[in-house]
C-alpha cells in the first residue's frame, strides 16, 4: 500500500513539474518577440480558426512553436478572439501583443501620395501600382472615372483631386480613394470661390481651378504664385492670350516628347493658349493649396510678362521690350551653366 501511495505521489510530482514547465513555456511564448526581422504584412482571412492561425503564423516564420501557441490560446482564451484583416507586425512585437492587435481589428494603413502638379492619369497609374488596392474601375478613361464618382459636372475632373498623402487599408477600392480626394478638393475650391477677390474674370469654379493648375505648372516658388497669377489675370482682362507653355504640352497629349518646337506652339488645340484667347476648357494638372489661393487672390501688379531667371525664380515685366531682354539674360545664364 505504501508503495502504491509513493508511486501516486511521484506521479503527481512529475505531473506537477510537467504542468509547471508547460505553463512556463506558454508564458514564455506569450512574452517572446516575433521571429521576424523587419515589418511584416500579415493577412488573416475571414473564418480562420485557432489551428489555422497557428499553422499560418508558423508557415510564415512568425512564431516557432505552433503547439505551444495552441496551449496559449486555451490557457488565455481572451487572446483567441481575432478579426479578419491585413495587419502590420513589427520585430519589437511580442506574441501577446500580436494577438491583441488581431483582436483589435486595427488594420495596417498604407500611404498613397498624390502630388500637386500631376494629372489624374498619373494618379490612376499610381492606384494601379499601389499595394492592396481593390481595382474596380474598368479602365482609366476620364469619362469612366467621372461616371464612377457620379460627378455632377463630368467635365470638371482634371485638377479636382486634393493632393495629399492618403492613408488606406487593404481592399480599399480605387473609387473610394478618389472620392475622398475629390470631396476634399471640392470643399477647398468652394472655400476659395466664396472668398475670392472681387472682379476676377472667372465664369465658374472650374475656371478658378484651371487658373490654379496653370500657376502650379508655371512656378514651384510659393512666394511668386500670386504674382504669376496677376500676369494671367491682367492678360485676361485686356483680351491678351495667356501664351503659357504648360497648356500646349497638355493639349499635345502623348505627342509631347519632352521638347516644344515653334510648330507645337502654332498648332491649334483646345488647350493651346498661344492659339486660343482666354482660359483653356479645363485644368491641366492638380493645383496645390498655394496655387489655389493665388488664383483666388492674385497680386495687384501691372505685369504682363514673366520668364525664368535661371536661379529658380522669375523676372516680371510690363512690356515686351523689357521681357525680351529678360529672355536674353536667361539664355545667357543657361549658356554659362552649360559651359561649366
From Swiss-Prot:
Q: Which reaction does it catalyse?
A: a peptidoglycan chain = a peptidoglycan chain with N-acetyl-1,6-anhydromuramyl-[peptide] at the reducing end + a peptidoglycan chain with N-acetylglucosamine at the non-reducing end
Gene Ontology MF term list: lytic endotransglycosylase activity
Function field? Functions as a peptidoglycan terminase that cleaves nascent peptidoglycan strands endolytically to terminate their elongation. Required for normal glycan strand length distribution. May function as a terminase for both classes of peptidoglycan (PG) synthases (aPBP and SEDS-bPBP synthases) by cleaving PG chains as they are being actively synthesized.
Q: Where is the signal peptide?
A: none
Q: Which family does it belong to?
A: Belongs to the transglycosylase MltG family.
| Name of this protein | Endolytic murein transglycosylase
Please give the organism. Answer: Escherichia coli (strain K12)
Which controlled-vocabulary keywords does the entry list?
Cell inner membrane, Cell membrane, Cell wall biogenesis/degradation, Lyase, Membrane, Transmembrane, Transmembrane helix
